[in-house]
């Protein structure tokens, strides 16, 4: 039994050691629990501090001065604004270089002007399209400016060309000149550099001028068609006196005021939108979106116009002039009868002039329809298939819309100078007189001898030259060189 005593002593020692460990374990776990609760409290405190910091960030923008901001805070914002997720980019899960990456998206440093993209140099794949657009724009610009200026100057400086008919043609040339001179450079600059000249002002002014030009052309074609019908059915003398300026200006005012009134909603519909790009900073584009700051009644009217714009555009600026011109021509042909049945009281010269005027109206209508048809087709495609088209396709359709208007402004004066014999002859005389100094004396001598009688007959028989009862001596056609 003696061996039991060492065993009992050893068991007692082991039991004492175990009890001591158990008694000391509760404070250990309690200490750990207290440490965890303190850590959670400290974490919650840090979270509240972060929330307070975020609240301060929202109301005190000076703390974010080192990060990029939107260029126009009051304007349209991108769907994913470039805002850092933490006031300290290197902490709390943020990458240390996130601020530098966000700043690299802009083309210039804060406080400096944005750099303009130049796709022409160095030469890349996009440079070829940029060169093609510039070349086409230069050709259209040169032809349109020279042609429209020629028509306006010829009508203005020639005494016998100041009639309502020629004044309407000159007003067409004036609006085409304004569209080419002001709108074409802005559109081409935006297409090449993705930056908008004059910002929101040009986004509103360019559509207004283009729609006004279409309205002037539409109402001018209707007025010319009415004039042709009136001449065909009138019993008054075919040669009428030269109209006064007040009468001509009154007729032009009706056309201009009506066209500009119908184009006023374009000023309220368009606005500038800026979108961030990974390599080029911000991209400027014009979108159809009425401003939310408009009055409620005006905003609803603009929204109604936006919803009905496509069909209004198609009906008023495409179908109306074509149908009106075709109807007037058919009625005029019906009143006059077939071309083979000529009246004895009508001279051959007068028949030629009437045929020439009818050809002018028909030619203007055909050119107008040919130039506005692509624009209307693109509008219909964008209205119904915009969700299925890519951004590049939509941009291409928008460029086609713009160039169709510019083509109309460049082709119309060329057609007038080719079809209208008085305008074309005056243009050739002016070019000859300006380019060749000896042409002036020779033309005067020849006109004094043999061409005087021919000019008188053309003046008296053409509607372009309304000869008054007591007219001064005949003046040379064209502008004084």
From Swiss-Prot:
Residues 156-167, 227-251, 332-361, 420-481 are cytoplasmic. G-protein coupled receptor. Has been shown to bind the neuroprotective and glioprotective factor prosaposin (PSAP), leading to endocytosis followed by an ERK phosphorylation cascade. However, other studies have shown that prosaposin does not increase activity. It has been suggested that GPR37L1 is a constitutively active receptor which signals through the guanine nucleotide-binding protein G(s) subunit alpha. Participates in the regulation of postnatal cerebellar development by modulating the Shh pathway. Residues 26-134, 189-205, 273-310, 383-398 are extracellular. The chain crosses the membrane at residues 135-155, 168-188, 206-226, 252-272, 311-331, 362-382, 399-419. This is G-protein coupled receptor 37-like 1. The keyword Glycoprotein applies. Residues 26-58, 70-108 are annotated as: Disordered. Coiled coil: none annotated. It is a multi-pass membrane protein. Disulfide bonds join 203-286. The modification Phosphoserine is found at residue 471. GO terms for biological process: adenylate cyclase-inhibiting G protein-coupled receptor signaling pathway; Bergmann glial cell differentiation; cellular response to reactive oxygen species; negative regulation of astrocyte differentiation; negative regulation of neuron differentiation; negative regulation of smoothened signaling pathway; negative regulation of systemic arterial blood pressure; positive regulation of cerebellar granule cell precursor proliferation. Keywords: Cell membrane, Cell projection, Disulfide bond, G-protein coupled receptor, Glycoprotein, Membrane, Phosphoprotein, Receptor, Signal, Transducer, Transmembrane, Transmembrane helix, Ubl conjugation. One of its GO terms (molecular function) is peptide binding. O-glycosylated. Undergoes metalloprotease-mediated cleavage which reduces its constitutive activity. It is found in: Cell membrane; Cell projection, Cilium membrane. It holds the Pfam family 7tm_1. Residues 1-25 form the signal peptide. It comes from Homo sapiens (Human). One of its GO terms (cellular component) is membrane. Expressed in primary cortical astrocytes (at protein level). Expressed in the central nervous system. The N-terminal region is required for constitutive signal transduction.
């Amino acid at each position: 039994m003696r061996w039991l005593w060492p065993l009992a002593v050893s068991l007692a020692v082991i039991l004492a050691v175990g009890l001591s460990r158990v008694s000391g374990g509760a404070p250990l776990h309690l200490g750990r629990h207290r440490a965890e609760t303190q850590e959670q409290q400290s974490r919650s405190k840090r979270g509240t501090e972060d929330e307070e910091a975020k609240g301060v960030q929202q109301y005190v923008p000076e703390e974010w001065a080192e990060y990029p901001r939107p260029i126009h805070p009051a304007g349209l914002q991108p769907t994913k604004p470039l805002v850092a997720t933490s006031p300290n980019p290197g902490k709390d899960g943020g990458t240390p270089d996130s601020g530098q990456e966000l700043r690299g998206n802009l083309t210039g440093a804060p406080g400096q002007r944005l750099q303009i993209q130049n796709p022409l140099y160095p030469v890349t794949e996009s440079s070829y399209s940029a060169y093609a657009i510039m070349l086409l724009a230069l050709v259209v610009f040169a032809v349109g400016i020279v042609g429209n200026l020629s028509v306006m100057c010829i009508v203005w400086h020639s005494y016998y060309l100041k009639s309502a008919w020629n004044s309407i043609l000159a007003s067409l040339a004036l609006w085409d000149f304004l569209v080419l001179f002001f709108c074409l450079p802005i559109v081409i600059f935006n297409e090449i550099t993705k930056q908008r000249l004059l910002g929101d002002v040009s986004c509103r002014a360019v559509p207004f001028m283009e729609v006004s030009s279409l309205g002037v052309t539409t109402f001018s074609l209707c007025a010319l068609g009415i004039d042709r019908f009136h001449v065909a059915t009138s019993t008054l003398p075919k040669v009428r006196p030269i109209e006064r300026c007040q009468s001509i200006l009154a007729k032009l005012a009706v056309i201009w005021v009506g066209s500009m009134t119908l184009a006023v909603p374009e000023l309220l519909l368009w606005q500038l939108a800026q979108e961030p790009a990974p390599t080029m900073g911000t991209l400027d584009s014009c979108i159809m979106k009425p401003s939310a700051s408009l009055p409620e009644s005006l905003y609803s009217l603009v929204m109604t116009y936006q919803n009905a714009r496509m069909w209004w555009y198609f009906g008023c600026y495409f179908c109306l002039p074509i149908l009106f011109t075709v109807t007037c021509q058919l009625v005029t042909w019906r009143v006059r009868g077939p071309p083979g049945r000529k009246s004895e009281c009508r001279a051959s010269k007068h028949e030629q002039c009437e045929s020439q005027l009818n050809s002018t109206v028909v030619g203007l209508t055909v050119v107008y329809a040919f130039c506005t048809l692509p624009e209307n087709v693109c509008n219909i495609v964008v209205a119904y298939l915009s969700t299925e088209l890519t951004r590049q396709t939509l941009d291409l359709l928008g460029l086609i819309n713009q160039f169709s208007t510019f083509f109309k402004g460049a082709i119309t004066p060329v057609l007038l100078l080719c079809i209208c014999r008085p305008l074309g002859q005056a243009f050739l005389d002016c070019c000859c007189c300006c380019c060749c100094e000896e042409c002036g004396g020779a033309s005067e001598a020849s006109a004094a001898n043999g061409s005087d009688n021919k000019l008188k007959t053309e003046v008296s028989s053409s509607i372009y030259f309304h000869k008054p009862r007591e007219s001064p001596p005949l003046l040379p056609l064209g502008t004084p060189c």
